[in-house]
Amino acid sequence: KYSKKYNYKYAILRYFNVAGPLQDYNRTIPPVFAGFILRIKGNHNPIVFGDYMKARDYIDVSDVNAFHILCMENEDTANQTFNLGTGKMTNLMDLKNMIAEIMDVKVDFDHYDAIAGEALNSYGDISKAKSMGWEPKKDITDTIKETIVYLENEIKEGNIDPFTFMEDLEIEKIGA
């Protein structure tokens, strides 16, 4: 109603799991890419809550940015809702294995109870976004590599210590 009354154009964008450099790794539960990478850098196993076969649709932040620009430049996106993801799921086991292979290490998981209410699988139907001429371009392995480089620089600059990363995590308050 507001958009019609004031001739205001909008686009609603539903992000799935945005990944890549500059993620806020200081959150209570850090983004999975940063969490896994920093735990490995600190000689710890990545932490997983619940089923390590749960899967998510990970999209690179640069692909999300590209769709933002498309929305600003293309009138056909006005007053519509779009899912932004890749349309592909990657489970935590595969993600851990990809990261470990790129980092040339062998790691297991530190496993904790599931987080209450967390979905087992989540991915987006991106067909509507694709109908606007947009396609996600970044492969998950490229996103992992760029995130590793970013986090290595954060470590080098003294912004984070991978050996103490997540040591204050209160597991019992997170799990079910």
What is the meaning of each model-derived region?
Residues Y15-V18, D51:
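Active-site loop/turn elements of alpha/beta-hydrolase fold enzymes
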Residues K41-A176:
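C-terminal substrate-binding subdomain of Rossmann-fold SDR/epimerase-dehydratase oxidoreductases
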